[in-house]
Amino acid sequence: MIFDEFTLKSQIRAVPDFPKAGVVFRDITPLFQSPRALRMTVDSFVQRYIEADFSHIGAMDARGFLIGSAVAYALNKPLILFRKQGKLPADVLAEAYQTEYGEAFLEVHADSLCEGDSVLIFDDLIATGGTLLAAASLVRRLGARVFEAAAIIDLPELGGSTRLQDAGIATFSLTAFALDER
């Protein structure tokens, strides 16, 4: 399927003042209600990464799980789950980070990766970059390396993709929105 940014953007709903005043939330649930848009999204990532040299896909809680798991399945790669604090049952490593809403903690199972593994980290969007930077730190603490950070949406005005690139992490997104774009 040929990528069509207009179709993709038309399936991402802008929700003003959610979860707090002044924030425009980018709701991707309509994308999942459109089989065409979902297939285009997954296929676009699969085409980009089909011949790439990485060993695992790491998906961010919770919306990163949705596309990350589909791409991991299509590429036959192991899926590593990065969860919000207190959601994983076994031994974990944790990393504090700042979001656009406040401080949070990201966790991963301590046995998820091995020395030398290479991880494509996935989230639904790149805003401040805090979640993906925390995931990258956890990947490195486990002895692995970050291949790239990928997302459906980039919000470049919030600086996350720049922060990731400044930390030596390549980024890729299917589309970008200006903060005031509806």
Swiss-Prot record:
Protein name: Adenine phosphoribosyltransferase
PROSITE patterns membership: PUR_PYR_PR_TRANSFER
EC numbers, comma separated: 2.4.2.7
Coiled coil: none
Cross-referenced Pfam families: Pribosyltran (PF00156)
Localization of this protein: Cytoplasm
Alphabetical UniProt keywords: Cytoplasm, Glycosyltransferase, Purine salvage, Transferase
Substrates-to-products reaction catalysed: AMP + diphosphate = 5-phospho-alpha-D-ribose 1-diphosphate + adenine
